[in-house]
A protein has these predicted regions:
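Conserved donor NDP-sugar-binding/catalytic core segment of glycosyltransferases
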Residues: 43-73
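C-terminal subregions of glycosyltransferases and related glycan-biosynthesis enzymes
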Residues: 71-73, 123, 130, 135-207
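Short aromatic/hydrophobic "clamp" motif used to bind/position activated sugar donors
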Residues: 31
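Conserved nucleotide-sugar donor-binding catalytic segment
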Residues: 24, 78-163
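Glycine-rich, basic loop-to-helix element that forms the pyrophosphate-binding segment
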Residues: 10-26, 47
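Acidic donor-binding segment of Leloir-type glycosyltransferases
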Residues: 1-9
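Acidic donor-diphosphate engagement hotspot in glycosyltransferases and nucleotidyltransferases
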Residues: 19, 40-45, 56, 120, ...
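The conserved acidic donor/metal-binding loop of glycosyltransferases
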Residues: 35-39
Length: 207
């Protein structure tokens, strides 16, 4: 079948700007994201689209590489994981290339923050999860970065210090938007710092 593909060229302004350009040109009722070094398994979209039939689900992600479901997430009786803001503040899930969501997400939550270079996808997921229904499937549907682990390898995610700044900014944003209270804000700021120190230790061990 003939594919309706639009190729857009623009100067490199970061991943958020590139994604936003694509989002602004998209015309369908559903939107899926795919980064340049990632790969969907053939049945990815057909598996995820079935979950939109219920009507109340707005955003569907899935697992990638060797990811496993862990605290604070668990599979519910309907066979998927409910993703909420507080859970995302504990642990970010839903790699960008696993995401499919309804167009109304853009109308309700806007676009990626083009001024934020690190953890910008997590920032957007948090905004979405606050007032839209987001789920994650217990299925590995995407291969990212050639299957490499996400910590300690080349690429944006290897810059742990900048990732930490992005994570702290995300918590600040959630507080400024009124999505979390003062006690939650203090707790998640400290918790993020502990996770950062843990990552540093892991990287030193791996090297």
């Amino acid at each position: 079948p003939e594919l309706n593909i639009t190729l857009i060229n623009q100067l490199n302004g970061g991943v958020s700007k590139a994604r936003n350009t694509g989002l602004k040109h998209a015309t369908g009722d559903f939107i899926a994201l795919l980064d340049s070094d990632d790969e969907w398994i053939p049945e990815k979209t057909s598996i995820q689209m079935k979950y939109f039939d219920s009507g109340n689900i707005d955003f569907v992600t899935a697992l990638r590489n060797n990811d496993k479901i862990s605290f604070p997430y668990s599979v519910n009786e309907r066979g998927y994981v409910e993703v909420t803001l507080n859970k995302l503040l504990f642990k970010i899930v839903g790699h960008t290339s696993t995401a499919i969501f309804k167009r109304k997400i853009l109308e309700k939550h806007g676009y990626f923050d083009e001024n934020q270079r690190y953890s910008e996808d997590a920032n957007y997921w948090m905004k979405v999860s606050h007032s839209s229904v987001m789920i994650m499937l217990n299925k590995k549907l995407v291969i990212t970065g050639g299957g490499k682990p996400s910590i300690g390898h080349s690429g944006l995610s290897s810059n742990i210090e900048e990732m930490e700044k992005g994570a702290q900014k995300n918590i600040d944003d959630m507080k400024n938007l009124g999505y979390i209270n003062v006690l939650e804000y203090i707790f998640f700021k400290l918790f993020a710092k502990i996770k950062y120190i843990r990552r540093i230790i892991i990287i030193k061990i791996l090297r």
